[in-house]
Amino acid sequence: MTGDRGRLISSKLLEHKTAYQVDRELSGTILFFKATYGASIYKLVYETIDPDGKPTIASGTVTVPKKPDFALPILSFQSGTMVKRDEASSTTGFDGNYGIVAMWTSSSGYLTVIPDYLGLGESELFHPYQMAQPNATVIIDMLRATRTFCDQEGLETNGQLFLTGYSEGGYTMMAAHKMIEEEHPEEFTITASAPGAGAYDMSGVMVDLMLSGEEYPSPFYLPYTLFAFDEYYNLWESPSDFLKEEYATLLPPLFDGTHSSSEINAAMPAVPMEIMEPDVVDAFSKDENHPLREALRDNDLYDWAPQSPMRLFHSTGDDLVPVENSRLAYETFQENGATQVELFECDCGTHGEAAAILLFLGFAWIESLADKSQPLSLNHHTVPEKYNLLSVYPSPFNSSTKIIFTLKEGSEVTLTVHDLLGKEIETLAKGRFPGGRYEFPWNASLFASGLYIITLKRTNSQGMK
């Protein structure tokens, strides 16, 4: 059972900023530039599936440039590691790191999509941290919900789809790129992707780093991964089966979605593996087919061949996700026949220090590929913002069809059908309607075959199809 994946459940305007306000927000950061457009951020709640394939809900944000004169490219940005549920984009809006990204990209002329992921925002599941399939599906379903949102709001996109993200967002972006090309090539076409500093080799590079016995700046990464994989792969009966008694009691409550990563790090030893039972570590180290190792191997993302342009970004000084992850992915992609993949390395500092720099460089590359010259269609130039006549579906039709329109506020509305001579032949709706989405059927079996004009009139405004 997969439910109605990508069905938009609700959308809500969270905040609007003018171009001047965006300039003030970004002033003094590496992302500073002259904003071209204001930006409005919306919270979306939509239907998706959990790691077991059962229907569930997820949330995210869509940020829209204000009044561009061209059809919009879509930029899907995947956020980095979060453990606190209310740190997600749909909760923070324009506040926080991801609000800055949304302002920056949308005020440059992109319709910016930021999924919250399962287990964050509205989702009450445990976040499937560093797991490819559930994160890819929630990203893809967010894109589907965004498509519906654009229809409802009368937003015109140009068919370009860019993917990017950093850290966990680099990993989840890679998972989404792979799934789109392998499972949904007829539904989505990726223009280009720019993954940054993702842990694409979970079973190799990242395992070796943890087993090294060295201190690690963000030790909470290890229990986050262990709890997620145990939750969805059923590796152990209880935390005490793999964690030392002290940590089996202390750590699970800290991952309930109400605690920050800094709180969890404060409860962790500097060497992450010290939380685990030595016999479990020993068994894992010696067994290439250990269930945990097999589960990690299932979620490696380096052994395939991207077909769309991709540029990987990574700092050689990354202290959390070694650059070897991107090097291995790049080399394997080439060996597998990929011809449009590049690797950009720089000595940009640690994982945290490099984030803004690499995101900026990735966005600059995306900017070089984006098409912002496609003019809006006639309907989008002439239909006022307060309402929108969305579609007549099916069209053409045999004997019946339905007309869909939206109102952003309560209005007096008349929906009529005219022939090509301008004669009104039927009134489908007339009266005052509250804001919302409406569908009206039209049975045309009593009229001759031909072309007809659907007219939606609102006070002092008119739209036609």
PLM feature segments, named:
Residues Y129-D151:
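Alpha/beta-hydrolase active-site loop
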Residues M1-D69:
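Catalytic-loop region of hydrolases
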Residues D52-S59, P65-W104:
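Short, surface-exposed "cap/lid" segments of acyl-processing enzymes
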Residues R311-D318:
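Short beta-strand/loop motif that positions the catalytic acidic residue
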Residues R144-Y216:
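Primarily recognizes the serine-hydrolase "nucleophile elbow" in alpha/beta-hydrolase
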Residues R293-E294, L320, R327-Q374:
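C-terminal catalytic histidine-bearing segment of alpha/beta-hydrolase fold enzymes
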Residues H381-Y393, F397-K465:
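C-terminal outer-membrane/trafficking sorting elements
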